Design a protein with these regions (language model features):
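Active-site histidine-anchored catalytic micro-motif
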Residues: 1-131
Length: 132
């Protein structure tokens, strides 16, 4: 029986593509897009996506971290998942991961991951993380 994993998106570079007009990265990739880009993901697990936010990680406030922790515990208590993957920007990823480690009540696994390159950049690295 396959496990059920919930991917919770928060934004960051992992959810950005290059804007053709400005050349800068802008939020443009949904959690569904990220999940669809992982080959044969459905062979490993049943995956659902919760779009929590889509902001640069520098905007991840203590209040947002608290809300994220509460959401994960709520979904866990409801028996909605066997584990969680949180996609996050790298600027504050470690702060959020530490906060979750200290605040979560659930014993279910929570993986916090990000990317250094946007989804449309050459050798984008977000998909490689899902194969580990």
């Amino acid at each position: 029986m396959k496990k059920h994993i919930i991917v919770i998106t928060t934004g960051g570079t992992i959810a950005m593509k290059k804007d053709p007009e400005t050349g800068g990265l802008v939020p443009a990739v949904s959690g569904e897009d990220l999940a669809a880009a992982v080959p044969r993901l459905s062979d490993w697990a049943d995956v659902s996506v919760v779009e929590f936010s889509n902001v640069p990680s520098g905007w991840m406030s203590a209040e947002k971290m608290f809300d994220l922790s509460h959401l994960i515990d709520k979904l866990s208590e409801e028996g909605k998942a066997d584990g969680f993957v949180v996609t996050h920007g790298t600027d504050t990823l470690e702060e959020t991961a530490f906060f979750l480690d200290m605040s979560l009540k659930t014993e279910k696994p929570v993986c916090v991951t990000g990317a250094m390159r946007g989804a449309s950049e050459l050798s984008a690295d977000e998909i490689g993380r899902a194969h580990v």
